[in-house]
């Protein structure tokens, strides 16, 4: 059974409507000494990163309220080293923005809770496609990310 939303989160859900999800920036790289086509990938570990960096409420010239949520996602292929930090062989990172129209001005608490618990749900399909595409272009091992809902 799903956990019941807090009052402030439910108010945000009722007030916000997704308008757009887009890529703000990205970076992808294989290290100089790493040839993904000719490497034994069984020794590599895949680590993931996901963070909601920030959110902001804007008022357009037409008086509309917009919530922008900045979400950073990443994956990296590492070679574990005993008693030391792993050696990064390749990585793919992306910053996405999710934009929502806001029916009424929300309290900061509601905006923050929504940003942390719901925005990633809207960004995730774009990240899955982006990561899959970058893996193919870089000839990295395919990473299949599950469909996911973030309910922290």
Predicted regions mapped to residue ranges:
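N-terminal intrinsically disordered, cationic/polar leader segments
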Residues: 1-121, 129-152
